[in-house]
Amino acid sequence: MSIITLTTDFGHKDYFVGALKGKILSEHKEAVIVDISHEIDLFNTLEASYCIEAAYHNFPKGTIHIIGVDSERVGDTQHIAMQWDDHYFICADNGILNTLIQKKIPQKIVAITIHDRLNTDVSDMAVFAAVACHISRGGLLNVIGKEIKSLKEVSVLTSSISDD
């Protein structure tokens, strides 16, 4: 049994969540899909990071977590798959996973390189679904990507209280 979690900023009004689940089930009928949240504020990577960090440890080791928040592959933002704490995380390299790796060194991180093996009009979520299904069938990360040693540095706003 493979568990694949979904955390997105898609909301529930449109067809996007259902289409993503359909894509996963079309490739891997035995997958168990669990929604963590689809109500992340649009492009709010900090909120997504908080949700993933708070939720992932409630799932068994080997769970695959797809994070579809600010997930477009533009500029120097690449898609990544990371094995960390015996879980797998698939998302854009946009800072979402930075809080996790501050606590424990990742077992492996790859920059996903299968985009050219899929249809030219494939969506980012279809790539994430293909990677999740590959991993859920016991596939290795180095088959779907090139190993990288670190994530993109992203500055995070922090709050503080002062007497001013």
Regions found by a protein language model. Give the residues of each.
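N-terminal glycine-/serine-/threonine-rich phosphate-binding loop
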Residues: 1-76
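Catalytic beta-strand/loop module used to bind and position nucleotide/cofactor moieties
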Residues: 4, 68-69, 76, 81-85, ...
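Short, electropositive, low-hydrophobicity segments enriched in small/polar residues
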Residues: 13-15, 99, 142
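Intrinsically disordered, low-complexity boundary segments flanking structured domains
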Residues: 22, 99, 156-160
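Active-site histidine-anchored catalytic micro-motif
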Residues: 27, 44-47, 51, 60-69, ...
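Anionic-ligand-binding alpha/beta catalytic cores of soluble enzymes and soluble regulatory domains
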Residues: 118-164
